[in-house]
Amino acid sequence: MNSKLSLSTKLSSNGKTQLAEYFAMPPFKVITLPSYDDAWANGLNAMQMSSSPGVLAGDLLEIDISLAKLTALSLNTQAFTRVQAMNEGDSAMQTTHILLAENSRLFYLPHPLVLHKDSVFKQKTLIEMDEQSELIYGEIVAIGRVLNDERFAFRQFSSHLKIYALQNDGKKRPLVSDCIQWLPSKMNLTALSQMENYSHQGSLTYLNLAKNNAEIKQQVQALQQQSAEEKDLLIGISQLNEYGLMVRVLGCRAEQIQKLFEKIGRLLKSV
């Protein structure tokens, strides 16, 4: 199935973020949520939903998100995304393109991805950021249905994330390039420095083009102190070359990583 979700934002006359354009093909759907107590006072809260039991063989999923100048969007998902079993030679793919205009802010944290036995899933995410924009973007993936004794029973998983800063001359400067490639039949993914005995991996990328390296360093140190209190998680927090940081987490419970990223998101929104 070919499915597409496209949405953009605009600023209302009273300075609040609204949906400007919205288009969704089944199984995608987006609903707006009430405004909660959020550090992004003018922001819009929304939920990305799906009526499908999961990602199936042959699925081509496309997500396009565009934020207008001065708008802020917090986008979550309804439930876990399950990549269902596939015949040999079949696969599914998702491409995501995000464009952040000047002084816009996006928090995007999809629920964890669960890789079922014999599944093949490839995803590519491209994010382009204009001046003074801010991004909090997370990904969480489970190695299988562990309670069903499925551990690394999928065939392949790949995730490519590329983030660029837009420049006045029309060129793009690379900020982040991150690649995960899992081939269980060819890789020892339980080895040291790989997944070891953990079953879930999460990564959270934070970029704020209005902050300098000294300010980012303070945020890294604050998060490192906070993460020391977390139990049963292996957490690494690194400062990027410029404008941001990345959090990488290994754990055994998806909900624990999800709650950690939500907590970090609230902290980053408030500084």
Swiss-Prot record:
Top-rank taxon: Bacteria
This protein's UniProt keywords: Chaperone, Cytoplasm, Nickel insertion
Localization of this protein: Cytoplasm
Gene Ontology cellular component list: cytoplasm
Stored InterPro entries: UreD
The keyword Oxidoreductase is annotated on this UniProt entry: no
Keyword flag Endoplasmic reticulum: no
Entry's Gene Ontology molecular function annotations: nickel cation binding
Pfam families in UniProt: UreD
Primary role: Required for maturation of urease via the functional incorporation of the urease nickel metallocenter.
Similarity remark: Belongs to the UreD family.
Assembly notes: UreD, UreF and UreG form a complex that acts as a GTP-hydrolysis-dependent molecular chaperone, activating the urease apoprotein by helping to assemble the nickel containing metallocenter of UreC. The UreE protein probably delivers the nickel.
Name of the protein in question: Urease accessory protein UreD
Taxonomic source organism: Haemophilus influenzae (strain PittGG)
